[in-house]
Structure formats: structure tokens, C-alpha cells
Swiss-Prot record:
Keyword list, A-Z: Cytoplasm, Heme biosynthesis, Iron, Lyase, Metal-binding, Porphyrin biosynthesis
Protein name: Ferrochelatase
Cross-referenced HAMAP family: Ferrochelatase
Known EC number: 4.98.1.1
Gene that encodes it: hemH
Organism: Aromatoleum aromaticum (strain DSM 19018 / LMG 30748 / EbN1)
Binding-site list for Fe cation: H211, E292
Pfam families: Ferrochelatase
InterPro entries the UniProt entry points to: Ferrochelatase, Ferrochelatase_AS, Ferrochelatase_C, Ferrochelatase_N
CDD domains on file: Ferrochelatase_C, Ferrochelatase_N
Annotated pathway: Porphyrin-containing compound metabolism; protoheme biosynthesis; protoheme from protoporphyrin-IX: step 1/1
Length: 365
């Protein structure tokens, strides 16, 4: 096998373009055990996600988890699947299209905006290859994780770097590391909450539920826990909420190890037992609604809270395609590629002259 993938044919006199690659976690191709199994295998084989020695983890993964979990996970996906497909995939694709439109409206036209999934399809490798074929010599990678974590953002960066080891002609690469405290992002979160409250009234308690990670990751220096707290504090301040009316929790614990606390579902059950009238839950760590928000929070946690004695439960959707969120995303992107945009685009006459010189020198294209 060749060490490097073949380079696409180059046409002299073609202007350089900038690629914007949005990346989210991923999704199976269908809500079936057969489709979930390879997706879970790819996800749980990532050493950034599971930091257990391979000799110990492989028998557990292949002998136990991949034989038991796909069917259960498929049932959960089926509960939130739409006619358009996986909600995460649908929202991410729409966000990419909207971002391209917002950039174009702002006069940024020499860009290619696309999207990929860290696990599943479309893969990072395939979309990077497509960007190269479209003439992108500069690429900004935007992991759609507001808070940085080694298991999410760093995994995306690992995958991009791994793909580029197979390229001969490398592009200039930049990454968005996080945007947990970006004013536009926090402002969009606050407005989404206020919009919900304007229609349904305010709750007794607002719970901000973030995806959890093992506590060991925090102990080893992962900044995720701190960035979640920053986001929660800024959001509470935007909403003018006193400390007794909101709290931060962590969801989606996997395995038996201790994860970041407090855990979301036990917290909601405790609120229910206390007779809390109404709880609203928002998930500020997710840019799009997905399995963890629509099934785990909106269905499972709702049942847990009401079953424990709570009176009313509201799930506040993720930002998805909200105008203020796409505007914030546009600002995040423009702030990272500003100097790229300042580079003058050669006039058509200059490009034609470049192409002619290349052909005179013997180039075929």
C-alpha cells in the first residue's frame, strides 16, 4: 500500500480556498443493532474515550459490551429517530449550510463549509479529502464541543492529524479549541431559556446538565470540569438567577468508575422527592439535540423526576439552528480565519496569466 494517498489533479491559475469543517461526535446509520454495533466499536475503541489498557479493554469491549449494548442502544435511538434520520446528523448538516449562508451574507465567499462526524459517516477523512479536491489550502476545524475535553475535542484533532499523515501536500490547519465563554454562545443559551420561559413561565429550579467524564480525567488535568462551571456561571448571570434557583449536573455516566458529580438523574430524583413543583433542564454542552438530550434527558430523566414526586418537567432544546447561535458560530469562525480572509484574491487576468505560464513550462493543466 502506498504511504501517501494520491493527490488530486492540480489546475494552475485556480484561486486558493479556505475550508471550514464542522465536526460533531457521530451517530449510527440507522436505529438498529446491526448499525449501532460498528458505530459503538469505533467510538469505544478510541483511546481518548476509554483510557484503559488495550489488553484489558479489548476482551470487555468485544466479548461483553458489543454483544449486549447494541440492542439496548438501538431501542434508545429508535425513540428519537426522525423521518430525516438521526437528529444529530440532521442538525449538524443544517448548521453547516446555515453557516455558509451567514458567511456569504457577511461577504465571505471564498470558503467551503462542510461537516463530518468523529465516528460514523461522513468521516473526517472523507470530508478532508473532498475539501482538498475543491482546492482548500487552508482548513479551519471546528469541533462543535463548547467545552474542551480530551475525549472530544482532542480526539477530533487526533483524527485530523492522523488523516494528514497520509497526505503529501499538507494544508494550513487551524482548530477551534473551545467556545465555552464566548459571549455570543452564552447569549444564545440565555435567550433560548428566556424564549422558553416567555411561553411556559419560569420553573422552580433550572438544571444545567453537561455530559460527564471520568473524575480521573479531571484529576489528571483535563480542563473540562472547569469550563463547564464557567459556562454555567455565565449563563446563570445572564439570566439573573440566584444560586438557589439553579444547579450544574453531569449526565451519561458509563461504567462503574466515578465520574464528575453531581449526577443528573439522581439530582432530579432528589428534587422530585423534595416536592419541587417544576424543573427545567438545559444541556449547554451540546450544540445539537441528540440521543443524550432527547432520550436520556427529555424521556428518561423526565420519567425519573415525575416518578420521584416532581410535578412538571420541561426540557429546553439545544441551540440547533437558532439564528443567534449561527450568528455566534459565524463570529467564532471569522475570528479564527480573519487574516486568511485578508489575503487578496488574484484577479481573473492574473490567474489566467499564471495558468498560461504553467502550460508554457510544460504543465498539463
Amino acid at each position: 500500500m502506498a504511504r501517501y494517498w494520491p493527490e488530486p489533479a492540480h489546475t494552475h491559475g485556480t484561486p486558493e480556498r479556505t475550508g471550514i469543517l464542522l465536526v460533531n461526535l457521530g451517530t449510527p446509520a440507522a436505529p438498529t443493532a446491526a448499525a449501532v454495533r460498528p458505530y459503538l466499536k469505533e467510538f469505544l475503541s478510541d483511546p481518548r474515550v476509554v483510557e484503559i489498557p488495550r489488553a484489558i479493554w479489548w476482551p470487555i469491549l468485544n466479548g461483553v459490551i458489543l454483544n449486549l449494548r447494541p440492542k439496548k442502544s438501538a431501542e434508545k435511538y429508535a425513540a428519537i429517530w426522525s423521518d430525516a434520520g438521526s437528529p444529530l446528523k440532521v442538525h449538524t448538516e443544517r448548521q453547516a449550510k446555515l453557516l455558509a449562508g451567514y458567511l456569504g451574507h457577511a461577504g465571505v465567499t471564498s470558503v467551503v463549509v462542510d461537516w463530518a462526524m468523529r465516528y460514523g459517516a461522513p468521516s473526517i477523512s472523507d470530508i478532508l479529502g473532498r475539501m482538498k479536491a475543491e482546492g482548500c489550502s487552508r482548513i479551519l476545524v471546528v469541533p462543535l464541543y463548547p467545552q474542551y475535553a480530551a475525549s472530544t475535542t482532542a480526539s477530533v484533532i487526533d483524527e485530523v492529524a492522523g488523516c494528514l499523515t497520509r497526505w503529501r501536500n499538507l494544508p494550513e490547519i487551524r482548530y477551534v479549541r473551545n467556545f465555552h465563554d464566548h459571549p455570543g454562545y452564552v447569549g444564545a443559551l440565555a435567550r433560548s431559556v428566556r424564549d422558553h420561559w416567555a411561553k411556559h413561565g419560569e420553573p422552580d429550579q433550572l438544571v444545567m446538565s453537561f455530559h460527564g467524564i471520568p473524575k480521573r480525567s479531571l484529576d489528571l488535568g483535563d480542563p473540562y470540569h472547569c469550563e463547564c462551571h464557567v459556562t454555567a456561571r455565565l449563563l446563570a448571570a445572564k439570566l439573573d438567577l440566584p444560586p438557589e434557583r439553579w444547579q450544574l449536573t453531569f449526565q451519561s455516566r458509563f461504567g462503574k468508575a466515578e465520574w464528575l458529580k453531581p449526577y443528573t438523574q439522581p439530582t432530579l430524583e432528589a428534587l422530585g422527592r423534595k416536592g419541587t413543583g417544576r424543573v427545567d433542564v438545559i444541556c449547554p454542552g451540546f450544540a445539537s439535540d441528540c440521543l443524550e438530550t432527547l432520550e436520556e434527558i427529555a424521556l428518561e430523566c423526565r420519567t425519573a423526576f415525575l416518578g420521584a414526586g416532581g410535578k412538571a418537567f420541561h426540557y429546553i432544546p439545544c441551540l440547533n439552528e437558532r439564528h443567534d447561535w449561527i450568528a455566534a458560530l459565524t463570529d467564532i469562525v471569522r475570528s479564527r480565519i480573519g487574516d486568511w480572509l485578508e489575503a487578496p484574491v488574484p484577479a481573473a487576468e492574473l490567474l489566467a496569466a499564471t495558468a498560461q505560464r504553467a502550460r508554457t513550462a510544460g504543465a498539463e493543466r
